[in-house]
């Protein structure tokens, strides 16, 4: 009986030694080997009309659009575009990044003026699109719908 126990113990230790001597392969690193990380995407925390009473606007007036955004990577510029009714999208402004950190919202803030075209019919929809562009070329877009009253 003692001989069997010693034999089993010896086999157990020998098996453990064989398994620990085997080469351990790294986990599959396909993703790491085949993806180039170029940076992080900017974040748009909010895009609203200021003061925030309504999205109904008068033709011929100027509307202040409040953009709240941030990014872990350096920001290059902010593009503002508009689509009036069924027309083509047009660039309203391109603004170079200027640091404007807000302690209240913990984001950068930017007020973008938008002159609403005069002579628009009541009920015309205006879609505003803002795009934050990082220096690493990654972008984030969001839209805001306005209605002519």
Where are these regions (language model features)?
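First exposed extracellular module after export/assembly in secreted or surface-exposed proteins
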Residues: 31-149
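Bacterial Sec-dependent N-terminal signal peptides
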Residues: 2-6, 15-44
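Compositionally biased, low-complexity segments enriched in small residues
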Residues: 1-4, 19-20, 79, 87-90
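Functionally constrained cores in energy, signaling, and assembly domains
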Residues: 8, 17-19, 82, 118
